[in-house]
UniProtKB/Swiss-Prot annotation:
It comes from Kluyveromyces lactis (strain ATCC 8585 / CBS 2359 / DSM 70799 / NBRC 1267 / NRRL Y-1140 / WM37) (Yeast). The keyword Cytoplasm does not apply. One of its GO terms (biological process) is GPI anchor biosynthetic process. Pathway: Glycolipid biosynthesis; glycosylphosphatidylinositol-anchor biosynthesis. Pfam families: PIG-X. Glycans are attached at residues 44, 95, 169, 375. The lineage of its organism: Eukaryota, Fungi, Dikarya, Ascomycota, Saccharomycotina. Signal peptide: none annotated. This is Protein PBN1. One of its GO terms (cellular component) is glycosylphosphatidylinositol-mannosyltransferase I complex.
Length: 414
């Protein structure tokens, strides 16, 4: 993919940084890259790409809001040395003041979640053409977007395939650089990348230089899912009070670490905090209201787990608003995230050039926390609902039953 500027009256691209992490095959990065007249190509290679663009959006310049948006198409970890963990679905965090429809309040800011890309939720901040661009990106990319005083940083993540030459070039109006790397060493503490860093002249778009580089940094996340035996299941039979079972029987306590499960629940479910006791619970957790009486998207909760055992979290379903679509069930889904978090002696949030900022449950931990991903599984439950076309019959039957009961009681009393 060659570098193309994103220009509009409502947003202007200022900088572009493309990072390519190639799969290792015994050859150096220099052997895999071709430079032809200032255009860098990477033929017959596979790997991962972080495509970062910094844009200026004038309509946001006077607003103090900080906004962090992420979008992930699947529930797998997909953690790489150039991509931190992005939770499944569509997540927004903001410190905006005032109320925002469907957002829930937490001590650190307002939060919104959906398992589909909700472009309508972005219209409060962004011009329509920018939202349309993000919607197109969401079809084939994972996204991580931050907004600070008019500057919007858009990070797109996708795979490099060996049938794509992946040309990289400069432009006349955008400051452009590219990094092409592969992993030298990687463990739970440090990551080392080596390769080439290329820059282009702003104004002419001509290649300035490509130079060899090597650097070390600390990652805030490590993927332990392939080494773990942590399963996420629904206890059978599944009913209106589904029980999520988190199997940590193969895990043992770790010094300075705790195991956790994080839930983004849609409003069709709630947690009884006196039954399943969460460490944190924000959002809609009223025990009686039906889903259509709630204003927020649902709730978020964090549970501390016990290693060496099967942990259970009991959910409760709400009454679903009747519809006339002919279906007796409504499909509701949620995706629990299981991980363990450890205290370290350094501020990890400032140690990686690829880290974009706190997402999801990270907001509730200190900057010196290291996260280890264990599992994230999408769960779907069919909830019963009434057919609204039968409302009159149901109301008449209910009224008749009430009248019969009253008459029966009167007869027994007198």
């Amino acid at each position: 993919m060659s570098v193309q500027t994103i220009q509009s009256e409502s947003f202007i691209e200022e900088k572009r940084r493309i990072t390519v992490l190639l799969d290792r095959d015994g050859r150096s990065v220099e052997e895999k890259v071709v430079n032809r007249d200032g255009v860098i190509t990477i033929p017959n290679q596979s790997g991962h790409v972080q495509d970062r663009a910094v844009l200026f959006v004038p309509q946001l310049a006077s607003r103090p809001d900080f906004i962090h948006i992420s979008w992930k198409r699947n529930a797998e970890a997909d953690i790489t040395p150039i991509k931190s963990y992005i939770p499944y679905g569509f997540n927004i965090f903001t410190n905006s003041s005032g109320s925002i429809a469907k957002f829930i309040d937490t001590p650190v800011g307002k939060v919104y979640y959906s398992d589909t890309f909700e472009d309508n939720a972005l219209s409060k901040w962004f011009p329509p053409e920018f939202v349309d661009q993000l919607l197109r990106y969401s079809e084939d990319n994972d996204l991580d977007i931050t907004v600070t005083r008019g500057r919007v940083e858009v990070n797109r993540y996708y795979e490099l395939t060996d049938d794509n030459l992946f040309p990289l070039n400069g432009t006349e109006s955008v400051k452009t650089e590219a990094g092409i790397f592969q992993v030298d060493t990687e463990d739970d503490t440090d990551t080392s990348l080596s390769g080439l860093r290329c820059t282009w002249h702003t104004g002419s778009g001509a290649l300035n230089k490509c130079q060899r580089t090597l650097f070390f940094y600390n990652q805030i996340y490590a993927d332990k899912s392939s080494l773990s035996e942590v399963s996420l299941t629904l206890s059978e039979p599944v009913n209106l009070h589904p029980v999520v079972q988190i199997d940590l029987t193969s895990k043992r306590p770790i010094h300075n670490c705790e195991y956790y499960a994080y839930f983004n629940l849609p409003k069709y479910f709630f947690i009884d905090q006196f039954q399943s006791i969460p460490t944190l619970l924000f959002g809609e957790h009223d025990l009686e209201l039906p889903e259509y009486k709630l204003s927020g998207f649902g709730s978020i909760s964090l549970f501390t787990l016990q290693p060496g055992s099967i942990n259970e979290v009991t959910l409760h379903s709400r009454y679903i608003k009747p519809t006339n679509d002919g279906s007796a069930f409504f499909e509701a889904a949620f995706t629990p995230q299981v991980f363990y978090a450890c205290d370290t002696s350094i501020e990890l949030t400032k140690r990686s050039p690829f880290y974009t900022g706190k997402i999801g449950y990270e907001h509730f931990f200190t900057d010196n926390t290291k996260f280890y991903y264990l599992n994230s599984t999408k769960m779907t439950i069919n909830l019963p609902k009434l057919d609204s076309s039968d409302n009159l019959c149901i109301q008449l039957f209910t009224l008749g039953l009430v009248l019969f009961s009253v008459l029966y009681l009167i007869r027994k009393l007198f």
